Structure formats: C-alpha cells, structure tokens
Amino acid sequence: MYPILQFAQTICNDNLELKNFCQFNASGTNKNLEPTTTPASSLVSETAFKGSEETLPIIEAIKKNVCKANWRQTYSTSEVGEDFVNRHCYFELIGPTGHFYNDAIRGFICYWGENLHYKWHSHEAEEIYYILGGKALFKTKTMTKVLKANETQFHKSWESHAMETLEEPLLAFILWRGNGLEKLAQIDD
C-alpha cells in the first residue's frame, strides 16, 4: 500500500486545490489492515481507466495492489440497491480507520461502475473529490458539472450532493477534513 500512499502524497503536493484543502502527511503508521473484497473490488484491476499524466501512476499502483486493500461498502442494498452495491467499493488509504493512521484527515480510493447513480447524500466532514480516471456528472443543489481525470469538486459540511457515472467507470481519490471525520455518509433521498 506504500506506493499508493506515496503517489497520493505527490498528487496532494502538486494539485493546488488538494494542497489548499489539507496537509496530506504520508508518514502515518501502517495499521496492517487485513485485505478484504467486495463484489466490485475485482472490477478495479480489470478496468482500463482513462486517466491523465498526473493520475496514471497512482491508477497503476491501485490496480497492482487491489488484493492488498481493505475494500468496504458504505451502504446496504436497501439504501442504494443491489446494482450499486455490486459496482461500488472503496478503501480508506489514510485516516482513523485507514491503512495508514491519521486523525486529521481521511483519504479514500473509491470506485463506481459505469452508468451508476450515487443518490443524494451528505456528511458532516468537508470533502474534495479528485478524479483519477473516468468521468462523472456531479450535482449539488446549485451546480451540475462533468469532471474528468485531474479535476476536483469540493463539498461543504452537510452539503447534499449526488453523482452519476457516465459510459465508463470512475476511480477517485477523496479527502475529508473537519468535524465528523469518524462518521460515514448518509443517504438524503
């Protein structure tokens, strides 16, 4: 998992929006989490993500380390449906319950399959999405825009937002900061 952590550090140092969002510190203690799988985790290594020059190194590191990650699900089938559960997964790279401990931020690697609707949801922690590969339509109550590799989207605390992947899967690096760091997102609709 160290290669992913190092590439995440580089991305946070090089991208102004991420750098301004938080101080990413790759020196957290390795918690040696047990690898776990979800129905979608094998799809990550099988997908040819459309990345950018900046994101291709971390994409390759993630794909090479799929079997070492502690993949998780946030929602139940009753909340988001079976298709979503089967085609979405994430692991916490850095944070209170991540592969590398940090109590000031959380950093997730998240995957969504193509043509997938991520319902309106919110959380107390502030958040910034950084797209590694693929593209998706992001929505808040005041904006709608398509993001692709090397682009970001910020969400304020408790700002309800939704996302739809398009004709290709999405891989994203997501950072959280502030209050509510220990909690997960909740479905709003």
Segments from the language model and where they lie:
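A short, N-terminal "cap"/entry segment at the start of jelly-roll beta-barrel domains
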Residues: 1-103
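Short histidine-centered beta-strand/loop micro-motifs
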Residues: 101-102, 118-123, 164
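Short acidic-glycine-tyrosine-enriched beta hairpin
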Residues: 141-160
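A generic structural signal for short beta-strands and their flanking turns/coil linkers
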Residues: 87-89, 106-108, 127
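Ligand-binding loop in jelly-roll beta-barrel domains
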Residues: 157-180
